[in-house]
Structures are given as C-alpha cells and as structure tokens.
Amino acid sequence: MDPSEYFAGGNPSDQQNQKRQLQICGPRPSPLSVHKDSHKIKKPPKHPAPPPNRDQPPPYIPREPVVIYAVSPKVVHATASEFMNVVQRLTGISSGVFLESGGGGDVSPAARLASTENASPRGGKEPAARDETVEINTAMEEAAEFGGYAPGILSPSPALLPTASTGIFSPMYHQGGMFSPAIPLGLFSPAGFMSPFRSPGFTSLVASPTFADFFSHIWDQD
C-alpha cells in the first residue's frame, strides 16, 4: 500500500498534495543489506522454568489442641438414675469416696485435692488473726490509760517524749551594754526604732509585749 494513499484517506486531490510533500530531495539511499555472518546467528532457546524452591517452608497449618489427661480417660457406662451417684463418686466430693473405691485409683488428682480441701477446716487461720487484733487493741488501750491521750499511729504521747536538755539552746547575754551577736545591735536602740529602713512587720514584732517579755525572761536568768 502506498503511504500517500494511507495518509490521504483515498481522496485523489489529497493524494497529489501528499506526494508533493513526500518527495525526497537528492539521491535515494541504498537499501540496507544484512551480512552473511549475521544470518548464522540464531536466537538462543528459552531457559527452562526454574524448579520450585526446596528451602521454602511448607504452608503453616494450625495444630489442633492436644488434651493431656492426668488420668487416662475411660468410658463409664451408667444409667440415668445412677448418673449423679457415679459423677459424685468419680469427682470425690468427700473423703469417704476414697475408702469406698479402695484407694481412689479411678479418681483424678484434682478430685483428691478438692476432697482434701473440703475435709480440712478453712477457717483455721481466722482465730489466730482475730487473736492478734485483740492483742493490738488491748495494747493501745493500755497505752492510752498510761499516757492519758488518745492513741495515734504516727505521733507518740507528749508525756512520753523526753524533756529538752538545758544546753540545747544557747543563752543570750550582754556585756557592757552589748547584746549577743545573734541579735542585731539596733534592735532596741532608738536609732533602730526611727530607722527609715525598718519594715512595718518588724516594728510590730519589736513593739509586741510578748516579744519583750521573752527576752526579759532570758536576761533575768543570767
């Protein structure tokens, strides 16, 4: 098929215009030729499909649960009227079942443990705990009567605290009109009362009679 006809769509006028546009200027190039050696080259065969990977783990299949019995299960035949008695005998609701069954060989260890717990008194430890509570309450009441205070958990009675020793506080003394170094010099001087740098709270502290009585009591002891 002429390419001009393909592009022109079959119209004669369009074909002529297309031929004019597709005219090659200059000599036509020589056709391509294939060398003889190239004909000897053959396409290699396809590679065979790779074998399945043997290292690949098999698909995961979930395992079914395995039931482990302490006692091998066995079938026990019983009628409807004897069903409750058979179940009670095998589960062991009392210690007398083992005596009747000749040692309880057909009874599971869990049933033996349950029967042992039922036979032993569970409230054996409760009286001991109650006795300890009574002893603690009695001790607290005796301490309250001795010290004359309400018993507490953290703080002891004030009467039981040791008295403060006389040397725990350093005495305040004055020599030649000089106060102790622990007290500022201008505390009781007129300059200290009239100082513009004093705070209102400090003035009220100095003017308090309780504060003055406290220091006079210490000075009288000296």
Curated annotation (Swiss-Prot):
GO cellular component, one term: nucleus
Coiled coil region boundaries: none
Post-translational modification comment from the UniProt entry: Phosphorylated on serine residue by MPK4.
Localization: Nucleus
Keyword Transmembrane found: no
Pro residues composition-biased segments: 47-61
Biased composition (Polar residues): 12-21
Positions carrying Phosphoserine: S30, S72, S108, S120
Main location: nucleus
Assembly notes: Interacts with MPK4, WRKY25 and WRKY33.
This protein's name: Protein MKS1
Annotated organism of origin: Arabidopsis thaliana
Origin organism lineage: Eukaryota, Viridiplantae, Streptophyta, Embryophyta, Tracheophyta
